[in-house]
């Protein structure tokens, strides 16, 4: 079990479906290396790690898989994960959970995780459901549910979030976050006229740029893997929470 930074939080009443089911997704299909059945590999620091840097974009077919190669530098640390675009408009929770699990084990399918999470067409209700499924599949008690009820978050909540990002990534545990992205405060490519309720995974950080690497299963605007400022991440999670 991890060293606890705070006590385990209670469940959040957070709906994690896309605002418009299927809006970010096109026809079904899965990318893979020619003749091998393995997903293409992606290098995450080729264009740097400043906020807004897109690592992968343009692959938005449901089920598309990419192999994200982790790196470790003096300031940055990212993890090896098996990324996959969510297969339905309301499976962001299962897809983000699958990405997180893939850092440590061969993950179940999105459909299997949707069943474990109790995901419906209304989405995945509570971040605590994600926490429980992560721990159950890994046979661990590492993951805890952390609430961020204040919007904007308090400095103590932001400090805890950054500490969780660094601690978890350094121990090979991606975070799963439940976010609310209103117009005017959205990651790249999100529908600018809608408030998006969503789950995505945090799979790395760069301490020098104070950025985090996001694996976003929705593929809004064709953006899959991108660097986001930590400060923006901290404003997207309230009033929901995250599993770390």
Tell me what each language-model feature is.
Residues 75-122:
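Active-site nucleophile-adjacent alpha helix/oxyanion-hole segment immediately C-terminal to the catalytic cysteine
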